[in-house]
């Protein structure tokens, strides 16, 4: 089991394949994805890696977190996520993960916070069919109808599909295909839609319900020191 990655959702576009087919894809950006800390069995009781992504202003980071980043010799990050890994899957603190962590054609699971829709009725929230347009139905055309039984049990069961707050929830979309990766620009192109709005953070992991392809970099695809040094002047020039 490998570590996942943290990525920022850039938006959607389309890619043209060699046979002329066009595929809708979501573009995910790896923004300074680094290992911030390790969790070990001896010290923490489990093994995991803590990854950080995005750049945070120092004045917006708490004193405790500034010390945490300083101990790892890593710049303050906007987003931190832990990924459980086996002992041999631990990654060195400070290492930067590349977009080549995934292979083209590989299946992945993407987790994010869905776009909030506010209060929604049963037809929009749960795809209910609603009541009849006529034949005695007045006012209640879009209502959900009956919600339970009679005197026994005399209540509405928890989890009953009714009107309520829609979206803004943690959602995982499984078995999405990696169409293309661009290590130079730190981009991963995922077939179809992924949860969340533009500029939202998502996590991407190897699909749990599909067999991993051969040749996956283990424990991760890391950027070399030369690649990191080559990117630094370019980033400074853009700023």
UniProtKB/Swiss-Prot annotation:
InterPro entries: Ribosomal_uL3 (IPR000597), Ribosomal_uL3_bac/org-type (IPR019927), Ribosomal_uL3_CS (IPR019926), Transl_B-barrel_sf (IPR009000). Gene3D superfamilies: 3.30.160.810, Translation factors (2.40.30.10). The modification N5-methylglutamine is found at residue 151. GO terms for biological process: translation. It comes from the Bacteria. Disulfide bonds: none annotated. GO terms for molecular function: rRNA binding; structural constituent of ribosome. Keywords: Methylation, Ribonucleoprotein, Ribosomal protein, RNA-binding, rRNA-binding. Methylated by PrmB. Pfam families: Ribosomal_L3. GO terms for cellular component: cytosolic large ribosomal subunit. HAMAP family: Ribosomal_uL3_B. One of the primary rRNA binding proteins, it binds directly near the 3'-end of the 23S rRNA, where it nucleates assembly of the 50S subunit. Belongs to the universal ribosomal protein uL3 family. Part of the 50S ribosomal subunit. Forms a cluster with proteins L14 and L19. This is Large ribosomal subunit protein uL3. The lineage of its organism: Bacteria, Pseudomonadati, Pseudomonadota, Alphaproteobacteria, Rhodobacterales.
